[in-house]
Amino acid sequence: GFSTVSADDAAAVLADAPDELVVLDVRTPEEYAEGHLEGAVLVDFYDADFADQLGELDPDVPYLVYCRSGNRSGQTLPLMEQLGFGSASDIDGGILAWADAGLPIVAG
């Protein structure tokens, strides 16, 4: 299914995550370089072929999606549902909420 989760809940999901869980960052490469969740896969929401890039991902594994504040990721979930993905959660408040919760961010 598809849901929105708090940063703390997202951290709990990651701590107990199945190996196939994919963390998906839908921000720009510049934003990603400034700091992202460890192991996150980058697909830029603003790319003209964003939907095509999403469509190349495995629809049968679970996803944890985030952006800066929750706006882009919130728009990404309905698109993933249309593309036939089975399960995705969106971090409410994005990486800003994640950072505010004191959770780890990796630069580079």
Predicted regions: what is each one?
Residues 1-21, 29-64, 71-108:
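Rhodanese-like catalytic fold shared by cysteine-dependent sulfurtransferases
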